[in-house]
Amino acid sequence: MAIPGKVQIIPLDSATQLGPDAAGSVLVIGSQATAGPALWAAKAGVRALILHDTGVGKDGAGLTALPFLQELGMPSACIDSKSARISDGKDMLVRGIISHCNELAYGLGTAAGQSCQEAAELMCQATPFEGQPDAS
């Protein structure tokens, strides 16, 4: 149950599960940290976002959400793939360890090595996202 006036931290297994309750919340989503899930979250009006780094990948492909969301003005971070299961938002929230974050998240106190829970709580301070992401 949502508490009026309190920013909610919502774990989801996939960005495809985004619903109307996502707006203004901090989401911890078990999806890869690429532009697709980031765009869906931005369109949903998420306050801040934590995704899975899925092992980072070649040329940092698993982190492309971070600069994308930085440009839009949304704090975001990724958890280390070795710390929590992919596609399991609750596991990420409980056991996840931050591997990377964008400058906006860093400015709120988020840093590599921090627990996902602590990072999510810090991101509750973020200004609600009100941008209009480009669908391209």
What is the role of each PLM region?
Residues 1-135:
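Residues that scaffold, gate, or flank divalent-cation-dependent active/transport sites
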